Amino acid sequence: MDRQMLIKEAIQAREGAYVPYSRFQVGAALLMKDGSVIRGANIENASYGLTNCAERTALFKAYSEGRRDVVAIAVVADTKRPVPPCGACRQVMAELCPADTKVYLGNLQGDIQEITVSELLPGAFTAEDMND
């Protein structure tokens, strides 16, 4: 699957967003090693701190189903520039994905930025930092 197809999956994932407060729909799509796709959307809460971003929704869904073979991630929102992940999502990606995992950031105008997980969060705190 090419990056454009994965971006389309993320655009479709936006439709599952629960955003009654901000109306800011974000979709994410994970490409798995076997070629399958796992989607996620952002889910808001009246207590904003409990909101879950699309990237984390997709990753937690994959992991909860025993799927840990992420090859690429696409994230899309209706923004002027390709939508950047928040700090929490960057940390979760650094924990759950290989450092060289491709991340495609996009918007509805078709702009795409390609980056890797390690480039999103240089010097990430990981499990290796906890081992002696």
Curated annotation (Swiss-Prot):
Protein name, entry field: Cytidine deaminase
Family: Belongs to the cytidine and deoxycytidylate deaminase family.
Residues binding substrate: N42, I43, E44
The protein's Enzyme Commission number: 3.5.4.5
SUPFAM superfamilies associated with the record: Cytidine deaminase-like
Cofactor or coenzyme needed: Zn(2+)
UniProt domain CMP/dCMP-type deaminase: residue ranges: 1-128
Keyword Zinc: yes
Catalysis: reaction(s): cytidine + H2O + H(+) = uridine + NH4(+); 2'-deoxycytidine + H2O + H(+) = 2'-deoxyuridine + NH4(+)
Active site: E55 (proton donor)
One GO cellular component, as annotated: cytosol
NCBIfam families given in the database record: cyt_deam_tetra, PRK05578.1, PRK12411.1
A Pfam family of this chain: dCMP_cyt_deam_1
Function noted in UniProt: This enzyme scavenges exogenous and endogenous cytidine and 2'-deoxycytidine for UMP synthesis.
Gene: cdd
Key words, A-Z: Hydrolase, Metal-binding, Zinc
Single annotated GO MF: cytidine deaminase activity
CDD domains: cytidine_deaminase
UniProt binding sites for Zn(2+): C53, C86, C89
Gene Ontology terms: biological process: cytidine deamination
